[in-house]
């Protein structure tokens, strides 16, 4: 009986152990599954996070790459523009005396060295921007060629071999007038082809009836009133022309440097002549400015060329900016009807063939065609 009881107990214990073992297995299985799901979820989140981080890195890298390329292109464009600007012909007062030893005959093109800066300054932000030196060198060469071609086109446009700058300053549009005893604004306005209100506004004058002796006023360059030249008989005119031609003959075959600068320029010859007549030279940044930069009120009369106009001995002729590289040209008329058809005239010129700036071309006779835009200045006084 005891043995049977023990056997039953053993069987029951064994069954209970199996049940506990099964419960333990189930628990372990559930725990394993939970841990596995947790780990899988964590890895998924980590992978997702890594993808986001990588995406951010990619976006940031893309933006940095685009920024670097933009900076590089900007620097290249800046360098190119800078080279083009620096490649322009430099206009300075001393460039008229360039070391150019070859004389240029009338009608030939002007050759001039063009200095191009090929050491541009590049700047970069940070250490991540790398500039390709080969590409930059290529850009510099392209810019150099473009600058040379641009300036060569400007050279080809010159229709005359008179040496001068390619860019030039316009003649001033106003001059300073000093108020004298008895002056009124209305009289000054009439004299300088303007209005009282214009002078008031230009000079900040509140009361047009109140100006002072010695007061400086800005007025237009060209005056309105031009005194009529004295009428002379044909005999006196012939004698005057003879005396003028005799004086001009003394200027021929000699070089004249009135201002001591830039050699024997055309302006120098004319200034020597005008100084002989009136005791002073003429103003003007270039020869073409002479009719506008001077007050010829009591010294000369200005004529614009027409089909019937005939220049007289002693007249100044002023060529437009189409000549002299933009500065014009000037000479003294010797014969106003050289061909008998009013198509040509003869004048005394200096530096017409571009040799005066190095003192290789003296004053000499030249025959010119009458040009539509020529201006002639006839002095009241004869030499």
UniProtKB/Swiss-Prot annotation:
InterPro entries xrefs: CHAP_dom, LysM_dom, LysM_dom_sf, Papain-like_cys_pep_sf, YSIRK_signal_dom
GO cellular component, one term: extracellular region
UniProt keyword annotation of Cell wall biogenesis/degradation present: yes
Domain Peptidase C51: 241-378
All copies of domain LysM, residue ranges: 175-219
GO biological process: cell wall organization
EC code: 3.-.-.-
Keyword Transferase: no
GO molecular function, one term: lytic endotransglycosylase activity
Transmembrane segments: none
Superkingdom of origin: Bacteria
Subcellular location, record wording: Secreted
Signal sequence range: 1-49
Enzyme type, top EC level: hydrolase
Role, per record: Probably involved in peptidoglycan hydrolysis.
PANTHER family noted in UniProt: LYSM DOMAIN-CONTAINING GPI-ANCHORED PROTEIN 2 (PTHR33734), MEMBRANE-BOUND LYTIC MUREIN TRANSGLYCOSYLASE D (PTHR33734:SF22)
Protein name: Probable cell wall hydrolase LytN
Organism whose genome encodes this protein: Staphylococcus aureus (strain COL)
